[in-house]
A protein has these predicted regions:
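Basic-flanked hydrophobic alpha-helices used for secretion and membrane insertion
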Residues: 1-161
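N-terminal membrane-entry
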Residues: 165-167
């Protein structure tokens, strides 16, 4: 996994590459069944965090009549790739991982003074200092422990569900 002290880095699942598309042809992997010619370990990967600004800049604005400037692109180094080909599925194949503290620091820097997309604001529209979550996933070491852990989470006042309920 990405090191905690190495700045923001991404670790890519082996099937993430299938979500890239060719901007010139507007085709994805699933359109052509050809893996994009991208080496995630060597090629620079540009990331746009301010997706609202991106879509506003590509669609002619936000409806106010003003042209929206394209948002800044960031090059995020790759710390590693999950083993496997695009045909090897696992529950983590389409995920991108990062050190959560490094990611939060980067988001706070990028959106300084503004709300990070998806985050709540106070009555004045100002962002809170903390990051809020509306969902977490808890992995349990053994099926025998799922109900106990689920009950502990529910006793803390949170909703909790598991696939074990369906078995």
């Amino acid at each position: 996994l990405p090191p905690a002290n190495g700045g923001l880095q991404f670790f890519y699942g082996n099937q993430v590459i299938t979500n890239f598309y060719n901007a010139k042809t507007n085709e994805y992997y699933w359109d052509t069944m050809t893996v994009p010619d991208i080496d995630l370990m060597k090629d620079p990967v540009f990331v746009i965090f301010d997706t609202d600004a991106y879509y506003n800049s590509t669609s002619g604005g936000d409806g106010s009549g003003q042209v929206t400037a394209p948002p800044k692109k960031y090059i995020i180094p790759t710390s590693g790739l999950m083993a496997g080909t695009v045909d090897d599925y696992s529950e983590n194949s389409y995920n991108v991982y990062a050190d959560i503290d490094q990611l939060k620091a980067m988001l706070k820097k990028i959106f300084k003074g503004k709300a990070i997309p998806g985050q709540p604001t106070n009555k004045a529209g100002k962002p809170y200092k903390e990051i809020y979550y509306d969902q977490v996933y808890v992995k349990v070491d053994s099926m025998e422990n799922v109900q106990e852990i689920q009950k502990v989470i529910q006793d803390m006042g949170y909703g909790a569900s598991s696939n074990a309920e369906w078995m």
